[in-house]
Amino acid sequence: MKKLNICLLNDSFPPVIDGVANAVLNYAAHIQKSLGNALVVTPDYPGAKDDYAFPVIRYQSFNTEKLVGYRTGNPLSSGLLKKIGEHDIDIIHTHCPLISGYIARMLRETTSAPI
């Protein structure tokens, strides 16, 4: 069976500690270990250390932590879709309907991968 390249998009990921960030971390680790290749795409957090067994693409974000508790990613970050496309994505998983969902829809148009 062909190993799949699965892109996981989420508006939060460690160093954020919440249930959704942990779920995406666990999904990516399981995919990388057992199913294929995981790629996590998430907003940038200053000082984030991405020393995982899978690649993490962080894109430009704005500090909205005092307003909403999280940073807000810029889905129009220069070169973001090109960077993701270099990973030959087979499946797109988005765990959030907002910014990550928007990026997933743009990515679907450029890769034809299902969401």
Residue ranges of predicted features:
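An amphipathic, basic-hydrophobic alpha-helix
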Residues: 63-94, 99-102, 106, 110
